[in-house]
């Protein structure tokens, strides 16, 4: 049995035309029956580093009994010159968070993933105590289990 949090993380590869640019981490989030990929905004666009991909590719698992079965899934970042992703904001302005919607009908029929939902979010008055254990899941610098395409998990 695979821990659900491992299936909520997505390995992201950015491209500009056929050229591979960078690796990144993201996670799936569902709200009102819609599926999103959440990542850092600089993954989609970063002027200071001149990072301007036109698409991303994520790895999707296809078989719960054989996690080595997976496929790449390409997601365009722009249509007719307009961004398909949205920049995160807070009271001070733009933050380094972005989301892009994933069209469920475009996913392979047997896609296996888990997604966070609004019930996983802390409320405005919830507090995390100093010293609370933290689990970090992702694909640092693209590093991952190359057989099963699973993320790295570390406790802090």
Q: Over which residues does each language-model region extend?
A:
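Cytochrome P450 catalytic-core helices
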Residues: 39
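Protease-domain processing segments flanking chymotrypsin-fold serine proteases, especially trypsin-like
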Residues: 1-25, 30
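Histidine-centered active-site/metal-ligand motif
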Residues: 42
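Compact nucleic-acid interaction/catalytic patches
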Residues: 45-50
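Serine endopeptidase catalytic core focused on the charge-relay Asp
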Residues: 17, 22-23, 30-32, 52-156
């Amino acid at each position: 049995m695979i821990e659900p949090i491992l299936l909520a993380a997505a390995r992201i590869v950015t491209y500009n035309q056929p050229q591979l640019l960078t690796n990144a981490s993201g996670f799936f989030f569902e709200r009102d029956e819609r599926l999103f990929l959440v990542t850092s905004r600089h993954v989609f666009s970063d002027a200071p580093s001149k990072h301007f991909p036109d698409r991303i590719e994520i790895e999707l698992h296809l078989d719960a009994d054989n996690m080595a079965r997976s496929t790449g899934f390409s997601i365009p970042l722009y249509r007719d010159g307009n961004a398909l992703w949205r920049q995160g904001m807070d009271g001070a302005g733009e933050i380094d968070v972005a989301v892009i919607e994933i069209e469920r009908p475009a996913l392979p029929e047997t896609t296996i993933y888990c997604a966070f939902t609004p019930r996983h979010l802390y409320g405005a008055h919830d507090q995390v105590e100093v010293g609370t254990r933290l689990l970090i899941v992702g694909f640092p610098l693209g590093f991952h289990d190359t057989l099963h395409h699973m993320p790295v998990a570390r406790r802090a």
